[in-house]
Amino acid sequence: MDSTIRPVTTDDVAELQKISRETFKVTFDPFTAPDDMAHFLDEDYATNVLISEIENPNSRFFFLLVGDKIAGYLKVNVGDAQKEHLKENALELQRIYLRSNFQHKGLGNVLFDYAEKIARDEKKDYMWLGVYEKNINAQHFYKRHGFKRVGQHVFQVGDDLQIDWLLLKKL
């Protein structure tokens, strides 16, 4: 499937908000109470929050396009934008999401490969991420890409304290 990747700018905030809310909800609705989900989506994907993240020089967002449709997106962090500091000289893969109708077509690999290329081009020694302990499909995806579990942390969704596994890959 032909695709292109392009950086997200503040002009794209409405589309970023739309795909962020949609893909997070689809992915985590089965595990999350409705009130907790609504609170998380309203807080973490608020327009001002997303603009601040886009403008942060240590965070970068990218859209994956199939034709003229936004199929998915990616967010990577370095430096103080990272949620944890597992290793020096690391890149955090904070978000990698595809819309449901674009899953299982190899596009997750396209986004992942793009993130890894960024890390390698910037001479990072490691990539890391957090993955929900109940998100088995994502765990298998990251294992296939060479990640190993090295710890865990709490990820708060509304009032729900969920456990994310911390995964690390040496580059």
Tell where the protein language model's regions lie, with residue ranges:
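Short coil/turn segments at alpha/beta junctions that flank glycine-rich nucleotide-binding fingerprints
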Residues: 105, 122-125
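Conserved acetyl-CoA-binding loop-helix of GNAT-fold acetyltransferases
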Residues: 104-117, 140-144
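C-terminal "cap" of GNAT-fold acetyltransferases
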Residues: 87-91, 125-139, 143-145, 152-171
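Active-site acidic-Proline motif in GNAT/NAT acetyltransferases
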Residues: 99-101, 105, 133-134
